[in-house]
């Protein structure tokens, strides 16, 4: 086994080196400034009055020259006559007796300087050690990759559910690592790199560890941000060291998590003409990938949720040969993931796997794992013997709407305002044909700043939405504000988030989807943000659009929002009596589930298809 230099050999070697330098320096200094003479010569110097400050020891006598003597400042002689001290007054020289130190005190005096330097060095190294992830100052260029030998990852493909397509793609990598010759008999070579792309929480890192667990090979895991440091050249050195370690342990897997921290396209975020440390590290990674020999048995796996910002040179064939999408699971995938995580908790007989999978549309693997754990915590708080379906329902509400604020009670006026606002959303959603189911309406404060909420969950996985469906969603978003204006005559600040979401959706319809009849099927937005990140972003108008076109776009957005607001107002006005009756029930009970809400809104007048939208001139 190779012993790290700075861990076992560095400090003893450094100590001996400093001690040797100190002793050598002391010896050279003594040779330059001290003159050793016989006792007779020393006594002659005394007679001539050339000495002062005589120090008489047990075996040695020393003194300082009154003036420099051939560059020497001190003279030393071996004491021959013990009675020499008695004749000092005869020569008119002051003297004093000294006790000569033993070898231990001399050694300690010699080592004082080196020990101080060593202590300072050790202190600074520990500071850097903590900041640089454990490598220390002497090992700052070493890779910080965590190594999981053979099957010690503890993860197999059976532990990863809901991503069957991704597992099928990665199974080939496992087969190549297990038996390269059998799978290369037709001339096929093992891919050099596999890029796992997908939203956060979908199991990319877990998949990479499962590949290593299935193949039974060493697994080198490191984050892309761990390559970049404050010292120039450290990142490139760590890339080289990582690949050298992997080649020495081949067959092996290198896994770089959050590759976008390292592989961002060159030129992004740097000064014009600049060449920062990150780009130098990326260049070294490209060189290592080019130098990969497939027969060595080293595979590079990487994960990112920002593939659109990666350098094109990194994604070309011959580097990352295969790109695998790890997306959010569908209903059957969610069922499989829930089955894996639910096996770790005690479930009640009313547990319904299919029902929980149906109401968790859009949940990623990490979200489902958190849901099962949250449901178990809910059951634990009420001291139950098993986790029930109701516990899962409460857990979903906590995840989606936030934690209930038991001490954030509203006054009667605010409670009435919030009740009408939330029912404005709920009734418009019930009246429109293509909106998501309303599962619950509550005026109990939840989360950060939410005084109430209307919980809607889709009943099935949807990948496309028609124009009429988007207009219905706009109508539901503005239903709360429309209810406030209808009942109280003016809006409140509670609709701020609804307005922001509705405006973003309307701009998407006009700028990205070409859903305005006047502007036609033209995309006016710049390239959108990554669809894998999952963060809503307001679309930005392309610089190619003229000022006149920008005015028409603003008018189209205003027309969409105005039409949705008018439509919501008409729905609520047509069902005003039902709105008042349901609001009274909501204020009394504070929460209405789907069954109670449907009972209170029986006979609700449904809205028809949206009429043609006219832009404001």
Curated annotation (Swiss-Prot):
The chain crosses the membrane at residues 8-28, 103-123. Its cofactor is Zn(2+). It is found in: Cell inner membrane. It holds the Pfam family Peptidase_M41. It is a multi-pass membrane protein. Binds 1 zinc ion per subunit. Gene3D superfamilies: 1.10.8.60, P-loop containing nucleotide triphosphate hydrolases (3.40.50.300), Peptidase M41 (1.20.58.760). Residues 1-7, 124-617 are cytoplasmic. Its EC number is 3.4.24.-. Residues 29-102 are periplasmic. GO terms for biological process: protein catabolic process; proteolysis. The keyword Membrane applies. PANTHER family: ATP-DEPENDENT ZINC METALLOPROTEASE YME1L1, METALLOPROTEASE M41 FTSH. In the central section; belongs to the AAA ATPase family. Homohexamer. NCBIfam families: FtsH_fam (TIGR01241). This is ATP-dependent zinc metalloprotease FtsH. The gene is ftsH.
């Amino acid at each position: 086994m190779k012993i790290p230099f700075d861990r076992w050999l560095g400090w003893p070697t450094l100590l001996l080196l400093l001690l040797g330098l100190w002793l050598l320096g002391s010896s050279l200094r003594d040779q330059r400034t001290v003159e050793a003479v016989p006792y007779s010569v020393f006594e002659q110097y005394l007679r001539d009055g050339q000495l002062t400050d005589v120090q008489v020891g047990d075996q040695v006598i020393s003194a300082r020259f009154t003036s420099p003597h051939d560059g020497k400042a001190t003279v030393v002689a071996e004491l021959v006559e013990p009675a020499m001290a008695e004749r000092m007054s005869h020569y008119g020289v002051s003297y004093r007796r000294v006790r000569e130190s033993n070898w231990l005190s001399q050694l300690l005096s010699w080592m004082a300087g080196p020990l101080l330097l060593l202590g300072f060095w050790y202190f600074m190294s520990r500071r850097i050690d903590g900041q640089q992830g454990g490598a220390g100052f002497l090992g700052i260029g070493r890779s910080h990759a965590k190594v999981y030998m053979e099957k010690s990852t503890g993860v197999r493909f059976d532990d990863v559910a809901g991503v069957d397509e991704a597992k099928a793609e990665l199974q080939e990598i496992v087969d190549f690592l297990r038996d390269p010759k059998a799978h290369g008999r037709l001339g096929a070579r093992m891919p050099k790199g596999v890029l796992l792309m997908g939203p956060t929480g979908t199991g990319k890192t877990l998949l990479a560890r499962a590949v290593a667990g299935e193949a039974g090979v060493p697994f080198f895991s490191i984050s892309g941000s761990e390559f970049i440091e404050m010292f120039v050249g450290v990142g490139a050195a760590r890339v080289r060291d990582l690949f050298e370690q992997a080649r020495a342990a081949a067959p092996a897997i290198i896994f770089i998590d959050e590759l976008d921290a390292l592989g961002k396209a060159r030129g992004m975020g740097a000064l014009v003409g600049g060449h920062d440390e990150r780009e130098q590290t990326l260049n070294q990674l490209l060189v290592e990938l080019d130098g990969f020999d497939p027969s060595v048995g080293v595979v590079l796996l990487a994960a990112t949720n920002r593939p659109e910002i990666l350098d094109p040179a990194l994604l070309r064939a011959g580097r990352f040969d295969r790109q695998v999408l790890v997306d959010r699971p569908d209903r059957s995938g969610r069922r499989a993931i829930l089955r894996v995580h639910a096996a770790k908790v005690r479930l009640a007989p009313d547990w319904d796997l299919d029902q929980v999978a149906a109401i968790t549309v859009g949940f990623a693997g990490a979200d489902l794992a958190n849901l099962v754990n949250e449901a178990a915590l809910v059951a634990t708080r009420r001291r139950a013997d098993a986790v029930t379906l109701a516990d899962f329902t409460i857990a979903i509400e906590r995840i989606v709407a936030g934690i209930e604020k038991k001490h954030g009670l509203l006054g009667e006026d605010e409670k009435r305002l919030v009740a009408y606002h939330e029912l404005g959303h709920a009734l418009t959603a019930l009246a429109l044909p293509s909106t998501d189911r309303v599962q619950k309406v509550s005026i109990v404060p939840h989360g950060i700043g939410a005084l109430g909420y209307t919980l809607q969950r889709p009943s099935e996985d949807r990948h496309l939405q028609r124009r009429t469906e988007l207009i219905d969603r706009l109508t539901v978003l503005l239903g709360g504000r429309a209810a406030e204006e209808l009942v109280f005559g003016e809006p409140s600040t509670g609709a701020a988030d609804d307005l922001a979401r509705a405006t973003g959706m309307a701009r998407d319809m006009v700028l990205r989807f070409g859903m305005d009849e006047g502007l036609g099927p033209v995309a006016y937005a710049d390239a959108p943000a990554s669809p894998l990140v999952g963060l809503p972003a307001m679309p930005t108008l392309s610089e190619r659009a003229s000022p006149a076109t920008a005015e028409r776009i603003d008018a189209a957005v205003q027309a969409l929002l105005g039409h949705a607001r008018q439509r919501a107002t008409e729905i609520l006005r047509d069902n005003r009596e039902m709105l008042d009756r349901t609001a009274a029930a909501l204020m009394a009970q504070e929460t209405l589930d789907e069954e109670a809400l449907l009972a209170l809104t029986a006979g609700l007048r449904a809205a028809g298809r949206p009429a043609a939208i006219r832009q404001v001139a």
